[in-house]
From Swiss-Prot:
GO biological process: ATP synthesis coupled electron transport
Lineage, uppermost ranks: Bacteria, Pseudomonadati, Pseudomonadota, Alphaproteobacteria, Rhodospirillales
GO MF assignments: NADH dehydrogenase (ubiquinone) activity; NADH:ubiquinone reductase (non-electrogenic) activity; quinone binding
Keywords, comma-separated and alphabetical: Cell inner membrane, Cell membrane, Membrane, NAD, Quinone, Translocase, Transmembrane, Transmembrane helix, Transport, Ubiquinone
Major localisation: membrane
Catalysed reactions, as listed in the record: a quinone + NADH + 5 H(+)(in) = a quinol + NAD(+) + 4 H(+)(out)
Provenance organism: Rhodospirillum centenum (strain ATCC 51521 / SW)
Transmembrane segments: 9-29, 37-57, 73-93, 104-124, 126-146, 161-181, 204-224, 236-256, 270-290, 298-318, 324-344, 370-390, 404-426, 447-467
Family: Belongs to the complex I subunit 2 family.
Pfam (any one): Proton_antipo_M
Protein name (Swiss-Prot/TrEMBL): NADH-quinone oxidoreductase subunit N
Membrane topology note: Multi-pass membrane protein
Length: 481
């Protein structure tokens, strides 16, 4: 029997799940006109859950028969996830109304997906890992196809569902191999088993490769990236904004925990897999984005490249590498949320526009929005003194300390190549002639754009010490054993 105190480490997840169900009931009783109210209450629920998460920081607790762990690593990842959810729901409110998609189920599904993500980063067992992953995925499948009257949205949802189901099968097969050859699915028992002098069975290594492949799909790492451009382009733009941040943060944090915590002693076996995926992701992301004219497809390939940079830190397999990954994720969140806030504001005569050329002359009609977008592009490209430069600096330094010199050099070269398509957007905004005037962004979107733009340049230096210390504390918890 589970004692009452055992539920306390999972209090944020329980609160958010109850809030989602309460908001679902509220939407049912109030009807279709409740979307705005439910959305803002969902933002409030995410913020309260964030406070509950931070209140438990510094403590380490394992509960639910070893299935769930609450530690500083989970706290850091959950704060990022909840921040991403709150910001993307804020951006969605006006978009849903303008696109006639305002249904109260939308923010509820986002909250349920967030609960799944929080369970993922606190998973201490392959079974709880899968449960959290599927809770997230089932919600995301629905919101990817949320715009039922738009063929591309239905196509995006179907593609994501089919390929996501395949990746789940691959992950389950890998988990079954690990259990079959080790006799356990618990992370702590696996870590103890592999810390002995007895070499790991070949079946365990093969199972780990399958699990890594299943998780690589969730983070859009090459060669499991094929769904990303089509889903990013076809899904409603507010959904794409959510996909670009929260699920990526959760899946990559889970990827780090799985490889470093139970399988840290098998670094020699999984390091080469991560090395290849990092190189392939950086190369594909930087080269394929060059020819894109649709800004959402460009951001899809950009996200693939950025996952490659984050994997550089993971490939190091060190505490410094994990710290670099977490710092990178925090900066990546701000850059992408800000960029998609601008994309969501791209309206001409009431209709959404998605081509890069539609930003022509933006500096003349909306100079502050153009300046913010330039900040995001410079930061995504890793140009100093933007925050994105320091994100890449920490992962590359970790790779060099781990003697992965080739990986670091490839990362620097692909980062230089990626500047082409980021600077192209800056050139279009500031030097091309004004074609059509983009409408003024909604107040909520303008606040998000301004806040994230300030974060990626001046404000980052103010909070950098807190982010660095939080990431260091989170990374150290994975190396306690």
């Amino acid at each position: 029997m589970v004692a009452i105190p055992d539920f306390l480490p999972a209090l944020p997840e329980m609160f958010l799940a109850c809030a989602a169900m309460a908001l679902l009931m509220l939407g049912v009783f109030r009807g279709a006109d409740s979307t705005r109210l439910v959305s803002w209450l969902a933002v409030g629920a995410a913020l309260v859950a964030g406070v509950l998460v931070l209140a438990a920081s510094g403590d380490r607790a394992v509960t639910f028969a070893g299935m769930f762990i609450a530690d500083d690593f989970a706290v850091f990842a959950k704060v990022l996830i909840l921040t991403a959810t709150a910001l993307t729901v804020v951006l969605s409110v006006n978009y849903l109304e303008r696109e006639q998609m305002d249904r109260f189920e939308y923010p509820v599904l986002m909250l349920l997906a967030t609960v799944g993500m929080m369970l993922m980063v606190s998973a201490n067992d392959l079974i709880s890992l899968y449960v959290g992953l599927e809770l997230q995925s089932l919600s995301l499948y629905v919101i990817a196809a949320f715009r039922r009257d738009y063929a591309k949205s239905s196509e995006a949802g179907l593609k994501y569902f089919l390929l996501g189901s395949l990746s789940s099968c691959i992950l389950l097969y890998g988990a079954s191999l690990i259990y079959g050859f080790s006799g356990t699915t618990n992370f702590e028992r696996l870590a103890v088993m592999f810390s002995s002098d007895v070499p790991a069975a070949t079946g365990v290594v093969v199972g780990l490769v399958f699990v890594a492949a299943g998780l690589a799909f969730k983070i859009s790492a090459v060669p499991f990236h094929m769904w990303t451009p089509d889903v990013y382009e076809g899904a409603p733009t507010s959904v794409t904004a959510f996909f670009a941040v929260a699920p990526k943060v959760a899946a990559l944090a889970l990827f780090v925990r799985v490889l470093v915590d139970p399988f840290g002693e098998l670094l020699a076996q999984w390091q080469q897999v991560v090395w290849f995926s990092a190189v392939a992701s950086m190369l594909l992301g930087s080269l394929a984005a060059i020819q894109q004219r649709n800004i959402k497809r460009m951001m899809a390939y950009s996200s693939i490249g950025h996952i490659g940079y984050a994997l550089v830190g993971l490939a190091a397999g060190t505490e410094e590498g994990v710290r670099g990954v977490l710092i990178y994720l925090a900066i990546y969140l701000a850059m992408n949320v800000g960029t998609f806030a601008v994309i969501l504001s791209m309206r001409v005569n009431g209709r959404m526009v998605e081509n890069i050329d539609d930003l022509s002359g933006l500096s003349r009609s909306h100079p502050m929005m153009a300046l913010a977008m330039a900040f995001f592009m410079f930061s995504l490209g890793g140009v100093p003194p933007m925050a994105g430069f320091f994100g890449k600096l920490y992962v590359f330094m970790a790779a060099i300390e781990a003697q992965l010199y080739v990986l670091a050099v490839i990362g620097v070269l692909t980062s230089v190549i990626s500047l082409f398509y980021y600077l192209r957007i800056v050139k279009v905004m500031w030097f091309d002639d004004l074609m059509e005037t983009i409408e003024r962004p909604a107040r909520a979107s303008a606040l998000v754009i301004g806040g994230t733009a300030l974060f990626v340049f001046p404000v980052f230096y103010v909070f950098s010490e807190g982010i660095l210390n939080g990431a260091a504390a989170a990374a150290s918890t994975l190396f306690l054993r």
